[in-house]
């Protein structure tokens, strides 16, 4: 059964519509990621006033960006420090691009789960903002927990940052990052389809894809020297590297949705049906 589901998912990923949706998600994800990080760093710098939280975010970025992490971190921090109006611009851009991320995903999910109708434009806007806010809260909670863990370890170890401190903080950060990823996948699969989807039917897929996404990131970073983007794209290699990883992430999101739709027979409920389940092939 597992082999059958896996082959079914792989066949779906070879379809042109899957690649179209993934590229659309990738483009808007890149456009929304940096405004989101600017807002997050601004909150840390100007509301929480926490250097520990900033260090945690920097480590998050080093773990999740495939290349030129220090350059990106410095650029984001300089934006927050030097431009006061950038926060409002970031909010506006984030509102626009978050819709661009979730709109193609909703259409793709509705096809995967067999829901006939998509939401209206305003309905999708509302759900997109809700999901963007929820993902932002998840990220902020992860940062706060990681910073609290680092602060507690410093107290326990009397301020000494030795190898034990480094290993424990790194392990905690990776666990929190993976948990945050799982939470985001779960929210996408549960809320975004235009129909009632049972939480238990998408949770296993969200857990699997959250873990696979973290592993895939390391595999992608390992493969970068062989891809050799700088030789082909020159000064645009950073953007291409991020875009390619965003595209792969988009395909992984769609793969998880395909697996979730098959995980529990009759997992989805149409809006018109309160108690009847439909079987999705």
Where are these regions (language model features)?
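Membrane-embedded alpha-helices and immediately adjacent juxtamembrane helical segments
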Residues: 1-281
């Amino acid at each position: 059964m597992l082999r059958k589901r896996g082959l079914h998912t792989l066949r779906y990923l070879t379809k042109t519509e899957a690649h179209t949706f993934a590229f659309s998600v990738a483009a808007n994800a890149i456009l929304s990621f940096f405004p989101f990080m600017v807002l997050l760093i601004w909150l840390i710098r100007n509301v929480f006033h926490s250097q520990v939280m900033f260090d945690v975010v920097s480590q998050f970025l080093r773990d999740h960006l495939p290349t030129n992490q220090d350059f990106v971190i410095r650029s984001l921090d300089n934006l927050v420090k030097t431009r006061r109006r950038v926060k409002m611009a970031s909010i506006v851009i984030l509102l626009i691009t978050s819709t661009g991320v979730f709109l193609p995903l909703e259409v793709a999910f509705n096809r995967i789960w067999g829901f006939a109708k998509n939401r209206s434009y305003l309905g999708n806007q509302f759900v997109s903002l809700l999901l963007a806010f929820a993902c932002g809260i998840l990220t902020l909670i992860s940062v706060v927990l990681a910073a609290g863990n680092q602060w507690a370890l410093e107290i326990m170890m009397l301020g000494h940052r030795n190898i034990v401190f480094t290993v424990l903080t790194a392990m905690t950060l990776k666990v929190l990052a993976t948990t945050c990823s799982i939470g985001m996948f779960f929210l996408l699969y549960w809320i975004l389809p235009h129909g009632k989807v049972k939480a238990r039917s998408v949770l296993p897929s969200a857990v699997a894809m959250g873990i696979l996404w973290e592993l895939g990131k390391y595999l992608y970073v390992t493969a970068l020297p062989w891809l050799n983007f700088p030789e082909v794209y020159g000064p645009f290699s950073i953007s291409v590297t991020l875009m390619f990883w965003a595209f792969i992430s988009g395909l992984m999101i769609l793969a998880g949705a395909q697996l979730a739709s098959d995980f529990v027979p009759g997992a989805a409920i149409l809006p018109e049906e309160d108690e009847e389940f439909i079987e999705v092939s």
